[in-house]
Amino acid sequence: MKPLTPRQAEVLELIKANMNETGMPPTRAEIAQKLGFKSANAAEEHLKALAKKGVIEIMPGTSRGIRLLLEEEEPLEESGLPLIGKVAAGEPILAQEHIESHYQVDPALFHPRADFLLRVQGMSMKNIGILDGDLLAVHKTQEVRNGQVVVARLDEDVTVKRFQRKGSQVWLLPENEELSPIEVDLSCQQLTIEGLAVGVIRNADWM
């Protein structure tokens, strides 16, 4: 990767921080406002420069179409972030049998630090650029806030959704207008928060 200019590094850090706080990248207008650019077009130029340097991918047609790009290393040894595949009911998500491989990704690239990668299945979060086959970087925690994108386990299913809670009621909200929210009553249903989404990685070689 070519070195980033100070301004490009600032834009990249803002993208990471926004994903940490809200679970999604910022819009061009938000970047311009937070960094003092005169217009969203100025933010777009910095994003294009980051894309040319291989740091992000710009997805056309969506205001939040920004995705981190990393290259896969050959998994010659079991180091790096574990990639979680299908999760068996009742087993810890990081159980050895769930780990498909490891990626040579620096956990400190994300904030909070990523603890594992989860292969995304389906298009329920497509509106914020989380697509089928993507690798979701996850910080393992049960402490999450309303509005954050989480990895949740409900009965036998592991799902990626936006978290909303009021009292004993939890809503797992999709970012796809064709799908309905999942409503959970904690007084009679078991819901486990496996972690907080802290970034999305797309590897074209895996697609």
Swiss-Prot record:
Reaction it catalyzes: Hydrolysis of Ala-|-Gly bond in repressor LexA
Keywords: Autocatalytic cleavage, DNA damage, DNA repair, DNA replication, DNA-binding, Hydrolase, Repressor, SOS response, Transcription, Transcription regulation
One record GO biological process: SOS response
Known DNA-binding region: 28-48
Catalytic residue list: 124, 161
Swiss-Prot/TrEMBL site (Cleavage) positions: 89-90
EC number, UniProt record: 3.4.21.88
Molecular function via GO: DNA binding; serine-type endopeptidase activity
Keyword Zinc-finger in record: no
Disulfide bond annotation, renumbered to this chain: none
PANTHER family according to UniProt: LEXA REPRESSOR, LEXA REPRESSOR-RELATED
Matches recorded under NCBIfam families: lexA (TIGR00498)
Subunit structure, as described in the record: Homodimer.
Function per UniProt: Represses a number of genes involved in the response to DNA damage (SOS response), including recA and lexA. In the presence of single-stranded DNA, RecA interacts with LexA causing an autocatalytic cleavage which disrupts the DNA-binding part of LexA, leading to derepression of the SOS regulon and eventually DNA repair.
Family per similarity comment: Belongs to the peptidase S24 family.
UniProt name for this protein: LexA repressor
Organism field: Aeromonas hydrophila subsp. hydrophila (strain ATCC 7966 / DSM 30187 / BCRC 13018 / CCUG 14551 / JCM 1027 / KCTC 2358 / NCIMB 9240 / NCTC 8049)
Gene designation per UniProt: lexA
